[in-house]
C-alpha cells in the first residue's frame, strides 16, 4: 500500500499519514520500498496480530460478560486494545475460556500471533450468531 491509498483508507491528511509512517519506520514496524509502497516488517506483523488479539478478546468480553450486542462493541474494543499489560490479556483470555473467535466470527490470534486456519465458514457463522441470539 502507498501513502495516498493509506490516507484515503484512514480518511486522514496525507501529511499526517506520512508522519505516522515515519514513526513506524523508526520503530522498525514498517519499511518503504523504492516505489513508495509501505509494508509491515515481521516485527510489525507480530505487533499488529497482538493488537488484533487484544481487540477481539475485548469484543468477546463485552458481548459475553457485559451483554453488549455484537454490533456495539467495535469502538469500545478500539479503546481497550491499547492496554499494555500482557498478563491482563492472558488472564482475560483464560477468564473467557480461551475463545477461538470474536463475536463477528473472526479468529482470535493466540499469544504467539498464530491464527487458526482450518475453520470452515459454517462454524464461524454459528459461533458469531450464538452471541447475539442469547
Task: Name each region found by the language model.
Residues 1-12:
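N-terminal helix-turn-helix DNA-binding core of bacterial DNA-binding proteins
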Residues 8, 25-26:
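Alpha-helical residues within the helix-turn-helix
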Residues 18-22:
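Short, hydrophobic-biased segments on the C-terminal half of alpha helices
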Residues 26-33:
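A short, conserved structural fragment
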Residues 36-55:
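Basic, amphipathic "hinge/linker" alpha-helix immediately C-terminal to the N-terminal HTH DNA-binding motif
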Residues 56-100:
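Amphipathic alpha-helical dimerization/coiled-coil segments
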Residues 82-134:
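Mid-protein regulatory/catalytic core that forms ligand/cofactor-binding pockets
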